[in-house]
Structures are given as C-alpha cells and as structure tokens.
Amino acid sequence: MRRAAGSTSRFAAGLIAGTSRRGVAVGHGYARFDNDVLALTPRGAPRMPNGIETDVVLTVGEQLLIGDGQFCTASAILIAGPPWEARPSPRVALTIRPDANLAFDQLSGWGPGLTPLGDDILVGYTAAAALAGAPPTPAASWGDRTTALSRTLLALAALGELPEPAHRLLEDGNPQPLLRFGSTSGKGIIVGLAAAPASTATVCDGRFTVALSLPDGPQTFEVFLSEVEC
C-alpha cells in the first residue's frame, strides 16, 4: 500500500514525479540514483534540501526505484508529502573576521566524510551568492571533483537551497542548530556563508566563534550577525 511521506523537498518531489529510475541505498540514510542523491530523514531531524521525511530505514545495498509518482523501497512505497521550501528568506547578514581568504578551487573534495569539509564551505558560499543575487559560483565545476552527495548539495546551493539548520541562522539569527549540524558540516557552511560578500545590513547585533581545521591549518573565526536592511 502506498503512503505519503512527511515534508518533501522540491528536489525529492521532482525525483518522485519524474521518469522511473533505479537506485541503491548507500548508507547513512542516503539513496543514490545515478548522480543524484536523495536524503531520508526521520521526522524531527533537520530537513535537507535533497530530502524527504520518513520513518523508512534503508539497508546498505538495498535496491530502490523512484519515479512515476512513487518511491519504492524494500519495505514501503512512498508518495510525496507536503512541500518544504529549502530556500530560506534571509533576515540576517553574516560577516567574518579575520577574512577567510579561502582558495575555493582547492576546497572541492577536501577533507573526510560523505560531505568533505571543503565542500561544506563551498555549499555555504554558493548558497550565499544565490540568495544575494550575486554572480553564480562555479558550483558545477566544483561538484565534478567530489562525492555524489556533495555534487547534489552544491547544485541545490546554487539555487539557494540549504539544510534546515541554516534557515534558523539566516532567518532567526540562531547559530546553534547549524553549529551542531554534523561533525563539521554546519561549521563549514557557516564559514562559507559568512565569507561571501555581505548584504547591506544594519549594525552588528550578535557574534559567535567557529573553529575549523583548514588546508592551511587550524583557524578560529568570529562571525558577526546583522539584520538585513529591507
């Protein structure tokens, strides 16, 4: 019997509505369909721009089918649930000190993990450019040099779409959910967001620190929060 998933990102809804495709579960709640990676997150967990909320748990290597209006796993057939908007509406601008001076072309694929730290920084930087209406970053080129998951997230960041904890920072000025997101993923996204050219903003009304190990060695940044001018 088919059942509706929880909230569903634009990306996931597109996969479900699209042409039928076979895929495989790759672990940690991710399913790969060619170069597209879908995230399955339980209700209450941070939502992902490539995600769908569901209590379905995948087994590594499990064969999957998506498209023609449904997502078929070994244990369930899901249809898209209510839409979740993965593109935040920023009310907070970020600036960073000292200047990050990051060699962006060297960050793609740098670091361990499903989403290497370098890619997390690029996701934040790419999304910040998209949200500010700035010239686009070479996200597609960066994505060609890293994991399929990072490639998917970079493509979505180019549309301004980000994991839910980033919404809390950009919309509410609350950095804590993003600081707690993943081992270093959230911190990397913060540095990328703050390293992008800042929107016009009022005076600073908050700050916090982010410590990361970067290609040049450990660095500690201070991130300043300001209300975006309307």
Regions found by a protein language model. Name each.
Residues 1-122, 129-136, 140, 144-167, ...:
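Phosphate/adenylate-binding glycine loop and adjacent helical scaffold
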Residues 126-131, 195-199:
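Short glycine/serine- and small hydrophobic-enriched flexible loop segments
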Residues 187, 194-203:
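Helix-coil modules at protein/domain termini and other flexible surface or pore-lining loops
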